[in-house]
Amino acid sequence: MNRHFNATRKIDPSRGATLGDGSPNDMNRVEIGPTQLAFAEWHTARLDLPDLAAMRRFRHRRLTDHVVARGYAGLLMFDPLNIRYATDSTNMQLWNTHNPFRATLLCADGYMVMWDYKNSPFLSEFNPLVREQRAGADLFYFDRGDKVDVAADVFANEVRILLRDHAPGLRRLAVDKVMLHGLRALQAQGFEIMDGEEVTEKARSVKGPDEIRAMRCASHACEVAVRKMEDFARSKVGDGVTCENDIWAILHSENVRRGGEWIETRLLASGPRSNPWFQECGPRVCQRNEIISFDTDLVGAYGICTDISRSWWIGDQKPRADMIYAMQHGVEHIRTNMEMLKPGVMIPELSANTHVLDAKFQKQKYGCLMHGVGLCDEWPLVAYPDHAVAGAYDYPLEPGMTLCVEALISEEGGDFSIKLEDQVLITEDGYENLTKYPFDPALMGVE
């Protein structure tokens, strides 16, 4: 009997040429993305998938509109997350953060060019909005040695020619994060360098419909991973072996299993190591009848950041009264502040009208009471009143913005910290809390 097979091996044999998000149903594709595990969990949760092509067009239009509105010739991006936003392509993202070998130029007419690692120009070819792939933006000393200035001149000349053709007569160029020789070379070409980060942060602040669908999916995947981490912690803590790193490793593993990418921080601490906050997770063996607090800072499926925080009580005894009070105070803080969120409210109003933490928690409170979120922690930042800078954030909230609402309840000299954080979408008439993960009932005083 003859058996016939399609030349392309499918990721999901039950589907046609594309998966539910419009990406190729090809086992050997270049494009990264969610795994079948994630898709199955999202199907069970009845989540709508994003249309990735539509999401990419929305982002491209947002950036282009912001460039045109400022009268700029173009936007030159070196930051790997700005490049991800513009092109939806990745290449050694963490290595790229300290070895900036990639660049993307978005011209005022929408023409977009990618400079990539010389051996991997194919990594953005799946996106038709990227019109050209080139190499030569690696303007750092490790790669260029004492001739980095020569490489910078060649690169800057390419930028000049592209903008001559696609933004004739315009000489103001927005640049986000550029190496010193790159900056000098661009200025030598006659460009007036403008703040590209101001452009990208504001463009990224409002999410389109498919970005919101992607965030819902990413948030679900993150919360499933957090549940796996909690189950592990509750079953293992007290065995005399399990340490903070063992617990944190579960979140990493479960994130990657669902197509997630990395975690920005190491913010999990147990017992007295949770105070002061910002101690990174380490080899401390976790004990029963202690608090474990963490902040996900997780870049997950579709490159979307899910930034939520929780504190758990793990043990057979009841938590102390001061722990329960701190937890309840933190929940009140984020819930009260969340109620202020709606389109049109000015960011300074949020600062001025914040729920006030008890005096004993003021010194060690979190660095902000809210911040934007998308591909990572993003603009805007909502400061506490004593840290607010007049004129820094005089902008209204808009529908489609997503914010993380924070609480750190931590007394100086104490032996624990409560860390809480929910991720919220600004809707047309208010807000929607995207975070479904429950608060620990023992710390809430209901167990």
UniProtKB/Swiss-Prot annotation:
Residues 1-26 are annotated as: Disordered. Keywords: Hydrolase, Iron, Lyase, Metal-binding. A divalent metal cation 2 binds at residues 307, 371, 406, 421. A divalent metal cation 1 binds at residues 295, 297, 307, 421. It is an enzyme of class 4 (lyase). It catalyses: S,S-dimethyl-beta-propiothetin = acrylate + dimethyl sulfide + H(+). Its EC number is 4.4.1.3. Pfam families: Peptidase_M24. Its cofactor is a divalent metal cation. Able to cleave dimethylsulfoniopropionate (DMSP), releasing dimethyl sulfide (DMS). DMS is the principal form by which sulfur is transported from oceans to the atmosphere. The real activity of the protein is however subject to debate and it is unclear whether it constitutes a real dimethylsulfoniopropionate lyase in vivo: the low activity with DMSP as substrate suggests that DMSP is not its native substrate. Homodimer. This is Dimethylsulfoniopropionate lyase DddP. The gene is dddP.
